[in-house]
């Protein structure tokens, strides 16, 4: 079997909600993650949210995948309407066609779409790795982004997903793709 990298909802409208310095650092990390995945032959699958809020309506500028990390020709984009990227989408079919049984997950928003997709992937029997510094969110509920991300790592770690920093991703992907 094989692994795939999921890039969830890194769309212009969501990226623009991050502080400019955080947005730049996040995009830079994602660029390196994408380079590592592609260098090891790991397929990259994008997920794009369609719908509310208004900025994510299909065809609007905010709906587009951020150009800095845009898919290469042939890399699939799965359109979704719910937090869980598997719900009422063709994601399971795309992953099945690719022979994937392990997912490396990146994207936005940590406590919403990333969390829901990681949990559903694990429930469906995928081995799941969350790339520790390749997911982001906006501050909310009196919590900073770092507090939200750290909490998600504590909740998901080991029981649901491995947590791996992007600096160790290439080696992890190389091991999986050479099996």
Regions found by a protein language model. Give the residues of each.
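Active-site-adjacent betaalpha module
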Residues: 2-4, 31-40, 55-179
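Short acidic, Gly/Ser-rich segments with clustered Asp/Glu that frequently serve as metal-coordination loops
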Residues: 12-16
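Short, well-ordered beta-to-alpha junction loops that form the rim of enzyme active sites
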Residues: 49-50, 108
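N-terminal nucleotide-binding beta1-loop-alpha1 segment
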Residues: 6-10
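Short, glycine-rich nucleotide/cofactor-binding loops
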Residues: 17-24, 104-109
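A short alpha/beta connector and helix-capping loop motif
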Residues: 19-46
């Amino acid at each position: 079997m094989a692994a795939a990298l999921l890039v969830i909802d890194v769309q212009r409208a969501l990226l623009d909600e991050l502080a400019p310095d955080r947005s730049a650092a996040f995009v830079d990390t994602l660029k390196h993650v994408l380079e590592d995945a592609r260098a090891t032959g790991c397929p990259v699958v994008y997920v794009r949210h369609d719908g509310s809020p208004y900025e994510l309506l299909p065809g609007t500028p905010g709906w587009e995948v951020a150009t800095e990390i845009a898919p290469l020709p042939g890399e699939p984009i799965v359109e979704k309407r719910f937090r869980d990227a598997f719900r009422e989408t063709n994601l399971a079919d795309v992953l099945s066609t690719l022979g994937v049984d392990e997912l490396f997950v990146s994207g936005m928003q940590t406590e919403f779409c990333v969390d829901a997709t990681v949990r559903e992937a694990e429930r469906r029997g995928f081995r799941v790795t969350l790339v520790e510094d390749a997911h982001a969110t906006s501050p909310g509920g009196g919590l900073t982004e770092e507090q939200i991300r750290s909490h998600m790592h504590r909740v998901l770690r080991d029981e649901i997903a491995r947590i791996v920093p992007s600096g160790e991703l290439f080696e992890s992907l190389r091991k999986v793709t050479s099996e």
